[in-house]
A protein has these predicted regions:
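Short, aromatic- and glycine-rich surface loops/edge beta-strands on solvent-exposed regions
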Residues: 1-4
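GH16 jelly-roll
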Residues: 23-177
Length: 177
């Protein structure tokens, strides 16, 4: 998601997920069976078989935008997913952006995630890529678990970090990796 106060940049997201048979301690080379991917080959709207837009006012981290499913805020173009934050009046907010999830389309237990992303470094942005437990609506956060693959909040001087959230450490703290 993006949090913006002064507009934003295009963000390119590429996601590949792979999986394999898991032993107690799987070797890294074991996860070579591609089980899900989106190469963003079709210009226009996202593949609705893989992605869902969460729309409405920002309700997670005090963002100041409305999330939309409009092509103005997210589209596939030239092999990239572009998430676009815009300064505009919409549903009582002064900014729009897109929040895109896959949890209603595909669940993963083990595997490797490969992502290539270009993230903005502008004032007011908070680009992030997360893995969130698919049961978050029934057991709530942080009991469902969350792995922040990448977060680069402007409020943290754009320091890129990864964090593991769990019931004993919902703020991350010493579980930063």
């Amino acid at each position: 998601y993006l949090r913006t106060k002064d507009g934003g940049d295009d963000v390119a997201w590429y996601v590949w997920l792979t999986s394999g048979t898991v032993s107690e301690t799987p070797p890294l080379d074991q996860f070579t069976n591609l089980v899900w991917s989106d190469e963003y080959n079709e210009n226009g709207a996202l593949d609705s078989n893989k992605w869902v837009h969460e729309v409405g006012d920002s309700w997670f981290n005090n963002e100041v935008q409305s999330y939309t499913s409009r092509l103005d805020n997210s589209k596939v173009e030239d092999g990239k997913l572009k998430i676009i934050a815009k300064k505009e009046s919409y549903n009582g907010n002064n900014y729009t952006s897109a929040r895109i999830i896959s949890n209603t389309k595909k669940d993963f237990t083990y595997g490797r995630v490969d992502i290539k992303a270009k993230i903005p470094g502008k004032k007011g942005t908070w680009p992030a890529l997360w893995l969130l437990g698919s049961n978050f609506k029934t057991i709530t956060w942080p009991a469902c678990g969350e792995i922040d693959i990448l977060e680069a909040a402007q409020s943290n001087n754009f320091r890129v970090q990864s964090t593991v959230h769990h019931p004993d450490n919902y703020g991350g703290g010493d579980t930063n990796i």
